[in-house]
Design a protein with these regions (language model features):
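PLP-dependent amino-acid enzyme catalytic core
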Residues: 1-183
Length: 183
């Protein structure tokens, strides 16, 4: 299957649960920069971030093979919200591990989607190690933040943007682990 076909299939999966996010021109930025400026408002999605697209696609791919009873991931926020949201939609228990001092609003959102939140470690790496050990000990399905099925789901935002505004000459994306840039 071509990459475009993969994105179109992922879009069908994603749109079964959420609506496309808007892309809006920003005239004030345009006047300051001297060029057309479009912003893709992923903040309008249920979790407030593009990563929910990846979670929905990932869980759809799991459903096509064998849906686990429980999943786990380590995060500092948006990946955990994505997994919690998609797991709840799939009827799967989610365990999300975050470090001490994590953003309390992100923690509340993760719990709000029904996930079990564990606060372990002083930084993300320690949380990751704890989550990995717990996954092995309790036979939990590990949801990595960089899995191909997540990245393809995330890529549906670019499909929307390029379909709506096909003559873009530059695209700027935020980069954390890079799933938004890869998608």
């Amino acid at each position: 299957m071509s990459e475009l076909d993969q994105l179109n299939e992922a879009a069908r999966v994603v749109y079964a649960s959420i609506s496309p996010s808007p892309q809006i021109r920003w005239p004030l930025l345009e006047s300051r920069l001297g060029c057309p400026v479009w912003l893709k408002h992923e903040n309008h999605l249920p979790t407030g971030a593009f990563k929910v697209r990846g979670g929905l696609h990932y869980f759809a791919q799991l459903a096509a093979t064998a849906m686990p009873e429980r999943v786990i991931c380590a995060t500092r926020g948006n990946h955990g919200q994505s997994v919690a949201f998609a797991a709840a939609a799939a009827g799967v228990e989610a365990v999300i591990v975050v470090p001490h001092g994590n953003n309390p609003e992100k923690n509340a959102a993760i719990e709000g989607y029904g996930a079990k939140l564990l606060i372990e470690g002083d930084d993300f790496v320690e949380s990751l190690r704890f989550a990995d050990a717990l996954a092995q000990k309790e036979n939990l399905h590990w949801v990595p933040s960089y899995h191909q099925d997540l990245v393809v789901g995330v890529g549906t935002y670019a499909l929307e943007l390029l379909s709506a505004v096909p003559d873009l000459t530059r695209i700027y994306v935020p980069i954390g682990l890079g799933s938004g840039a890869c998608g």
